[in-house]
């Protein structure tokens, strides 16, 4: 077998030199004739190499460089990454139909970290030495966001890959320019809107301007309603609104209308009157009361001079304060919470409201003189 490896006539070994042949040649040596030997005998002696553990080490194989073998898979994988960027820049939904070998798991130490270049006709991405090239980084993850243009610079590519590798980026960010500027949705919500503007109450208060005050010629004071103030300087006989019963003058018509109600007793009008049910208004009714009570000296328990009220609230306040008896020490705000009794008939009730609705308004009290008109 050794003679066959040295013989040049073997075309297979001359065409495909192997490492085994070089390995065998290192252990071959030509012995020159010693001075003691005869000069006519020259022999070629080959020393055998050390025994290898591989039993088939003597078999010669063709060189791997001379065979038509495609490139390593990691180069094809880099080529596939470049094709993905190319298809992504051209806005194609699917990558190009380029044939490539199936991907193999290659240790990260065999991959060049600083000289990896992704070349493309429209975009170029360079991996710096500080960037990680471990298989955990998903550099070729599918991208669903559209891009505005295909011309990307090195900084834009690096920012794009950093966004893909860090999923903690907020989803509220949107890409609006080739430089991948981020704009939050909160800024869009607070943008001023020209249409359908609503003026707040504060703006109305700011736009509101007070009325200009005018100076009174008599007292030299300033008033916003000078006409109403001038009526206070008028004498009772010179005021514009005069009562036809007592010829008393009033500055405003409301004051005159309130004053006329006091004369309704004299004119005998029942319009708008609220009469106290326990007040003797005329002498005829007083005589009837004397017959009922049998005592002419009984007071009417009314401190009002006429017993006629022009307002309903003052009429009810008069009844609750004068004609209903509360427990000793009852305060005004506690009147609706305590029980009491009618001062005239001494009948007990739960509270003053119960006495008003079920005793006074129904004219149930036997000592009531004036009947209360029921509202229909």
Curated annotation (Swiss-Prot):
Biased composition (Polar residues): 146-183, 191-200
A molecular function (GO) term: zinc ion binding
UniProt keyword annotations, A-Z: Metal-binding, Nucleus, Transcription, Transcription regulation, Zinc, Zinc-finger
GO biological process: filamentous growth
Principal location class: nucleus
Induction: Induced in biofilm, by caspofugin, as well as by 17-beta-estradiol and ethynyl estradiol. Expression is regulated by SSN6.
Start-end of C2H2-type zinc fingers: 241-263
Low complexity bias: start-end ranges: 32-50, 89-103
InterPro entries: Transcr_Reg_ZincFinger, Znf_C2H2_sf, Znf_C2H2_type
Keyword Transcription regulation recorded: yes
Subcellular locations according to the entry: Nucleus
Descriptive protein name: Transcriptional regulator STP4
Organism in which the protein naturally occurs: Candida albicans (strain SC5314 / ATCC MYA-2876)
């Amino acid at each position: 077998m050794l003679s066959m490896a040295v013989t040049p006539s073997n075309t297979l070994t001359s065409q495909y030199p192997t490492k085994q042949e070089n390995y065998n040649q290192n252990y071959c040596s030509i012995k020159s004739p010693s001075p003691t030997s005869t000069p006519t005998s020259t022999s070629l002696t080959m020393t055998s190499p050390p025994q290898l553990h591989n039993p088939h080490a003597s078999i010669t194989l063709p060189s791997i460089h001379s065979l038509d073998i495609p490139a390593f898979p990691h180069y094809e994988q880099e080529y596939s990454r470049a094709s993905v960027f190319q298809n992504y820049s051209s806005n194609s939904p699917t990558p190009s139909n380029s044939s490539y070998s199936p991907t193999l798991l290659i240790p990260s130490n065999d991959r060049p970290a600083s000289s990896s270049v992704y070349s493309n006709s429209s975009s170029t991405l360079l991996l710096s030495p500080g960037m990680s090239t471990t298989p955990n980084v998903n550099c070729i993850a599918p991208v669903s966001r559209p891009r505005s243009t295909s011309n990307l610079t090195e900084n834009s590519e690096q920012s794009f890959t950093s966004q893909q590798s860090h999923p903690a980026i907020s989803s509220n960010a949107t890409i609006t320019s080739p430089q991948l500027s981020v704009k939050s949705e909160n800024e869009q919500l607070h943008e001023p809107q020209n249409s359908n503007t609503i003026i707040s109450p504060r703006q109305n208060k700011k736009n509101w301007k007070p009325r200009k005050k005018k100076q009174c010629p008599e007292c030299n004071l300033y008033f916003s309603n000078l006409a109403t103030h001038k009526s206070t300087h008028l004498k009772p006989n010179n005021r514009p609104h005069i009562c036809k019963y007592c010829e008393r003058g009033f500055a405003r018509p409301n004051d005159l209308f309130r004053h006329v109600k006091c004369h309704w007793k004299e004119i005998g009008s029942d319009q708008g009157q609220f009469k106290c049910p326990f007040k003797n208004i005329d002498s005829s009714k007083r005589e009837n009361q004397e017959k009922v009570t049998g005592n002419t000296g009984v007071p009417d328990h009314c401190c009002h001079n006429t017993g006629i009220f022009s307002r309903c609230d003052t009429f009810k306040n008069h009844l609750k304060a004068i004609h209903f008896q509360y427990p000793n020490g009852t305060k005004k705000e506690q009147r609706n919470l305590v029980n009491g009794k009618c001062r005239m008939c001494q009948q007990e009730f739960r509270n003053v409201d119960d006495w008003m609705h079920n005793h006074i308004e129904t004219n149930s009290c036997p000592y009531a003189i004036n009947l209360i008109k029921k509202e229909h």
